[in-house]
Curated annotation (Swiss-Prot):
Similarity annotation: Belongs to the universal ribosomal protein uS14 family.
Underlying gene: rps14
Protein name per its UniProtKB record: Small ribosomal subunit protein uS14c
Gene3D superfamilies per the UniProt record, alphabetical: 1.10.287.1480
Entry's localization field: Plastid, Chloroplast
Positions of the UniProt region annotated as Disordered: 34-56
Function: Binds 16S rRNA, required for the assembly of 30S particles.
Keywords assigned by UniProt, alphabetized: Chloroplast, Plastid, Ribonucleoprotein, Ribosomal protein, RNA-binding, rRNA-binding
InterPro entries, alphabetized: Ribosomal_uS14 (IPR001209), Ribosomal_uS14_bac/plastid (IPR023036), Ribosomal_uS14_CS (IPR018271)
A Gene Ontology cellular-component term: chloroplast
């Protein structure tokens, strides 16, 4: 089981990412726009605004975690579980439609 502080830190990052998502997205669109090209000085100002946002608001800082154990590795997106928990739940028939492989 992951430490509670790490799980809380990840939740805090998710909230920050949601809060600044639209701001970050609009700044990136303005920098990349080819319809109305910006001058070099305007682009640098936009980049400075982008860099002034909190680091933890960037989506690359997020990490998927198992919602039962908080484990950050070997997560299956479809289930939101780590491989260990997924395997145990399949063996106990707690996931409908998932079966053990046999050949």
């Amino acid at each position: 089981m992951a430490k509670k502080s790490l799980i809380q830190r990840e939740k805090k990052r998710q909230k920050l990412e949601q809060k600044y998502h639209l701001i970050r997205q609009s700044l990136k669109k303005k920098i990349r726009s080819k319809v109305s090209p910006l001058s070099l000085s305007e682009k640098t100002k936009m980049r400075e605004k982008l860099q002034s946002l909190p680091r933890n608001s960037a989506p690359t800082r997020l990490h998927r975690r198992c919602f039962l154990t908080g484990r950050p590795r070997a997560n299956y997106r479809h289930f939101g579980l780590s491989g260990h928990v997924l395997r145990e739940m399949v063996y106990e028939c707690l996931l409908p439609g998932a079966t053990r492989s046999s050949w």
